[in-house]
Amino acid sequence: MGTEAEPPSPPSPPAQQQEQANPPVWNAQNQKPARLYRLVLFFIAGSLTAWMFHAFSSSNLAWKLRQLHHLPTAHYLQTRDEFALYSVEELNAFKEFYDKSVSDSVGASFTEAEQTSINEALVSLRMAQDMYLTGKDDKAARLFEHALALAPRHPEVLLRYGEFLEHNQRNIVLADQYYFQALTISPSNSEALANRQRTADVVQNLDQRRLESLDSKRDALSAIHESNAALRRAKKEAYFQHIYHSVGIEGNTMTLAQTRSILETRMAVDGKSIDEHNEILGMDLAMKYINASLVQKIEITIKDILELHRRVMGHVDPIEGGEFRRNQVYVGGHIPPGPGDLALLMQRFERWLNSEHISTLHPVNYAALAHYKLVHIHPFIDGNGRTSRLLMNTLLMRAGYPPVIIPKQQRSKYYHFLKLANEGDIRPFVRFIADCTEKTLDLYLWATSDLPQQIPMLIQTESEAGERLAQMQSPNVAQRSSILEFYESGSGALP
């Protein structure tokens, strides 16, 4: 039998014939979707990888920011968001600068003199601890203070002195401040971190109670009618005092009597420079502007701040008054932003000043922060301190507080707390402003009380203080003395 022939295959359809005739073209067309699919997968995978890397970097950066004082984050002040001085945008803008500052400070080497001071401080520290263990607390305290004076930024000195203050002196606020400083210098210091975790909440509660006490005194003062003659006299005296002390902080040598004479008679004082006269007249113009206009405004703008500065400097330097500086300036160890950055920084400051966020701040905290932020930017060639203090008092007055007087005798402490704020902890400066606020409230309340003799608002010299105290007949001499000592001693500590 022969093999059966296979039936012929049916003819291919035209489409199949075309596909068989051109197989390479069909394969290329079939591979295009696969290649596009792979590109999409690669893009998604790359995006996820980039996102994960960014998330890791952000979390790592956030950890660093919480530990380092150079970056003003929420950790900047009691880890509370409302105290952060800068926005996230500002943090990103300044990150490179701060990272360089940290690396420079870590890699800095000590001079021979500095190393000698550190070695001596560590010897004093060991002796202080020995004295403390043997119950000689007074000697231990002096040795701790000596060690701190020799090495004020040594983590071990800050840590041990803080522990002594916390457990022996019961000064938990100052101890917490030193723990904070130790962490800013040595972020990985586990002892300092543990100590601060123990004290932070306690100190925060103490600060809150202090602010509530200020509110109570403010309310008591607000309850006194404006027609009260003693209140009117106190306000007039406080006006002279405010100008005298504010220009005195900047180095003006006029006495209180001379300041009052210039403001009341507009007559020159022999032996004093024209600039010193003009500084007083400029402050007078600025305070009248605040009382007549600024304190009633809902929002304070850059224009308002420029107008305030224009009056402060109007008699001293009318060309620079109300104008941003055009040169770089240096303020001690602080290097303010360059003139090219001032417009942007002041716009951000204006937004912060009028943001809804500030409604969560206590008025004293808000005013102190505004003071610090403006003086930190340092937008003017001169008059920054006076303008910042005037702005602070404007904000306090809008909240029902009287203008706060920062005594010129407290000048060194005032600048020291500003320096601590630049180094990362603004709380001591806020507490200092709270101290001054309380003393000012006490003086107003005392002046309007039923005591037979009113307490003097402020005293210029120790001899004058002694003379006034001898004239007082009130039985509560101790409290009178404590208020006077605040303005005379230079400690600024509350009794």
UniProtKB/Swiss-Prot annotation:
The active site is at residue 378. Disulfide bonds: none annotated. The chain crosses the membrane at residues 36-58. Its main location: membrane. PROSITE patterns: FIDO, TPR_REGION. A motif (Inhibitory (S/T)XXXE(G/N) motif) lies at residues 246-251. This is Protein adenylyltransferase Fic. The side chain of Glu-250 determines which of the two opposing activities (AMPylase or de-AMPylase) will take place. In response to endoplasmic reticulum stress, mediates de-AMPylase activity. Adenylyltransferase activity is inhibited by the inhibitory helix present at the N-terminus: Glu-250 binds ATP and competes with ATP-binding at Arg-389, thereby preventing adenylyltransferase activity. In unstressed cells, disengagement of Glu-250 promotes adenylyltransferase activity. The record marks 250 as: Important for autoinhibition of adenylyltransferase activity. The fido domain mediates the adenylyltransferase activity. Residues 1-23 are annotated as: Disordered. It comes from the Eukaryota. GO terms for biological process: detection of light stimulus involved in visual perception; histamine transport; protein adenylylation; response to endoplasmic reticulum stress; visual behavior. GO terms for cellular component: plasma membrane. Its EC number is 2.7.7.108, 3.1.4.-. InterPro entries: Fido (IPR003812), Fido-like_dom_sf (IPR036597), Fido_containing (IPR040198), TPR-like_helical_dom_sf (IPR011990). It is found in: Membrane. GO terms for molecular function: AMPylase activity; ATP binding; Hsp70 protein binding; protein adenylylhydrolase activity; protein homodimerization activity. Keywords: ATP-binding, Hydrolase, Membrane, Nucleotide-binding, Nucleotidyltransferase, Repeat, TPR repeat, Transferase, Transmembrane, Transmembrane helix. Protein that can both mediate the addition of adenosine 5'-monophosphate (AMP) to specific residues of target proteins (AMPylation), and the removal of the same modification from target proteins (de-AMPylation), depending on the context. The side chain of Glu-250 determines which of the two opposing activities (AMPylase or de-AMPylase) will take place. Acts as a key regulator of the unfolded protein response (UPR) by mediating AMPylation or de-AMPylation of Hsc70-3/BiP. TPR repeats lie at residues 121-154, 155-189. It catalyses: L-tyrosyl-[protein] + ATP = O-(5'-adenylyl)-L-tyrosyl-[protein] + diphosphate; L-threonyl-[protein] + ATP = 3-O-(5'-adenylyl)-L-threonyl-[protein] + diphosphate; 3-O-(5'-adenylyl)-L-threonyl-[protein] + H2O = L-threonyl-[protein] + AMP + H(+). Belongs to the fic family. It is a single-pass membrane protein. Homodimer.
